[in-house]
């Protein structure tokens, strides 16, 4: 009977350790995914910022070109 109790405690202990290790690995994976998401969000923000700046510059250039065509003597 004592052998059975020790075996049962050993199995329960090993199961608990295994579960703990799985939970820890799961948390680490979630943290890594969050970091990757943060990096991707930052890249998207910088990309959109660059696109916005280029569009603004293109708009200003187009406006200047139109003004130059409509008012050739005022430059």
Curated annotation (Swiss-Prot):
Q: Name one GO cellular component term.
A: other organism cell membrane
Q: Which cysteines are joined by disulfide bonds?
A: none
The Gene Ontology biological process annotation of the record reads: defense response to bacterium; defense response to fungus; innate immune response; killing of cells of another organism
Compartments in which it is found: Secreted; Target cell membrane
Organism, as annotated: Agalychnis spurrelli
Any matching Pfam family: DD_K
Q: Please list the residues that make up the propeptide.
A: 23-45, 74-75
Q: Which domain of life is it from?
A: Eukaryota
Similarity comment: family membership: Belongs to the frog skin active peptide (FSAP) family. Dermaseptin subfamily.
Native organism taxonomy: Eukaryota, Metazoa, Chordata, Craniata, Vertebrata
Signal peptide residues on this chain, from the entry's feature table? 1-22
Its keywords, alphabetically, are: Amidation, Amphibian defense peptide, Antibiotic, Antimicrobial, Cleavage on pair of basic residues, Cytolysis, Fungicide, Hemolysis, Immunity, Innate immunity, Membrane, Secreted, Signal, Target cell membrane, Target membrane
- Tell me the protein's name: Dermaseptin-SP4
Question: Where expressed (tissue)?
Answer: Expressed by the skin glands.
Q: What does this protein do?
A: Antimicrobial peptide with activity against Gram-positive and Gram-negative bacteria and fungi. Has been tested against E.coli (MIC=47.25-128 uM), S.aureus (MIC=189-512 uM), K.pneumoniae (MIC=189 uM) and C.albicans (MIC>189 uM). Probably acts by disturbing membrane functions with its alpha-helical amphipathic structure. May penetrate bacterial membranes, but stay at the mammalian membrane surface. Shows a weak hemolytic activity.
Residues where Proline amide occurs? 72
């Amino acid at each position: 009977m004592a052998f059975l109790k020790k075996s049962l405690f050993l199995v329960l202990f090993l199961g608990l350790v295994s579960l703990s290790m799985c939970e820890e690995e799961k948390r680490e994976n979630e943290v890594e995914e969050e970091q990757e998401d943060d990096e991707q969000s930052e890249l998207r923000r910088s990309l959109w910022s660059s696109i916005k700046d280029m569009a603004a510059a293109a708009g200003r250039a187009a406006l200047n070109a139109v003004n130059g065509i409509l008012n050739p003597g005022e430059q």
